[in-house]
Regions:
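Terminal targeting signals and extreme-terminal segments of soluble enzymes
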Residues: 113-405
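Intrinsically disordered, low-complexity segments enriched in small/polar residues
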Residues: 2, 69, 104-107, 181, ...
Length: 405
């Protein structure tokens, strides 16, 4: 569903209705599988529209994955046929109409209606609508759903944004996140919910610090520390936004680029992302065109209007920042996401919020990889709004392995 043709008020109402539908679907799953209920719609500070809440138990069992996030498909795994880079390289992609196919594949591979919602933005909002379990020991405990992914792995940006959201829910309203540093410890299973524990490490006069651990099956999949600060005055300067960048309206979207490719992962990139991503140079989905350089730029924004909660936009910015951050490493070596045998996974993620900006307005993401060595690569990113303000800075190291020739 695309909201760009609707007025702001109508889009907001549609989003709210879709989020409520998402929460209803999540509750239905909890009732069916675990006999408990999960709560109503929250903003990131926890104001809720209804009083039902509960804890989703973690189902047993995990797929065969190593600590760095590589995914090994078992013989009886229904996702085996979803994506195989080698088959893609062997021209197993067909040009055909594909409307509705991805959703049916999702329904076939998971019991979660929430994960198969036709509008990805409502799915993102529902994923960030964490349930406060009410448990108060030494930590605050929240739970949240996972969004369906064709490879069966939780998107790193999702668990990152959810962990940030959990931390936000435990600080005073006058304190805003300004930095976070997180480590991806294990891959998450996208067909299972996630539990988040928040340790209130420190509250000072100006700063607060929180540590969030994200768990599945009793094991941590992400460990994150976030810092918050009250609004303050001080020195100001910033780097300039690059010149001669074409406007996003003049660039093709992922949906345009991948239109007609009859392949689950291509359809997921084209239609199941909550953000419209538009590369300034050609994207690196299945091939690398142009110079093999360690840098790129792209525009992105949410596919529809989002609620006005600034904390929601900050968390969603972290979500989107993980989409393409490893691509400069690939581009430098002429490697595409569809390269046979490619194994790539995020190892850590650091982010600094400098100035507030909405994520349902166009943002420019400038990325550069200064080095790659030992099966790891580092990328640095800067996010600007259309007014040229530096909104955020990002750094991520990732594992990138390509079979030797």
């Amino acid at each position: 569903m695309n909201f760009h043709g609707q007025g702001h008020g109508n889009r907001s109402r549609v989003i709210r209705c879709l989020v409520q539908a998402a929460r209803d679907a999540l509750e239905e799953r909890a009732n069916r599988n675990h006999g408990v209920k999960v709560g109503g719609v929250h903003n990131l500070k926890g104001a809720k529209t209804e009083n039902r809440r509960g804890l989703i138990e973690q189902p047993d069992g995990v797929k065969d994955r190593d600590i760095h996030g590589e995914y090994t498909v078992g013989h009886d795994d229904p996702c085996r046929s979803v994506f195989d880079p080698a088959s893609a390289a062997e021209e197993n992609l067909k040009i055909a109409g594909s409307e509705g196919v991805l959703e049916s594949e999702c329904v076939r591979h998971t019991t979660s209606k929430l994960q198969c919602m036709s509008d990805p933005l409502s799915g993102l909002l529902a994923a960030l609508d964490l349930t406060d379990t009410g448990a108060r020991t030494s930590e605050d405990i929240f739970t949240g759903p996972s969004q369906w992914q064709p490879l069966g792995r939780v998107f790193g940006g999702q668990v990152l944004a959810q962990s940030i959201t959990a931390a936000i829910r435990t600080v005073a309203d006058d304190r805003f996140i300004h930095s976070t540093h997180g480590y991806f410890l294990r891959p998450g299973d996208s067909d299972k919910p996630i539990t988040f524990s928040v340790d209130r490490i420190h509250d000072g006069r100006s700063f607060s610090t929180r540590r969030t651990q994200a768990y599945q099956n009793g094991l941590p999949i992400l460990s994150l520390i976030a810092s918050f600060q009250v609004d303050d005055e001080g020195l100001e300067h910033q780097v300039s936004m690059p010149l001669d960048i074409p406007d996003p309206e003049s660039l093709p979207s992922a949906a345009d680029t991948l239109a007609g490719i009859d392949h689950p992962v291509a359809r997921n990139w084209a239609t199941q992302r909550a953000f419209d991503m538009r590369h300034v140079t050609s994207p690196v989905y299945f091939s690398v065109e142009g110079a093999h350089v360690p840098h790129q730029a792209l525009w992105f924004r949410a596919i529809g209007s989002m609620p006005d909660d600034p904390n929601l936009h900050r968390a969603a910015l972290a979500y989107a920042s993980d989409y393409s951050i490893l691509e400069p490493i690939l581009r430098a070596h002429g490697i595409a996401w569809g390269t046979p045998g490619l194994k790539a996974a995020s190892l850590d993620h650091a982010m600094w919020w400098h100035r507030y900006s909405r994520v349902d307005e166009w943002l420019l993401y400038v990325q550069e990889s200064p080095t790659a060595k030992g099966g790891r690569g580092l990328t640095l990113g800067q996010i600007f709004n259309r007014q040229g303000e530096l909104v955020a800075s990002v750094a991520q190291e990732g594992m990138v392995r390509v079979p030797s020739a």
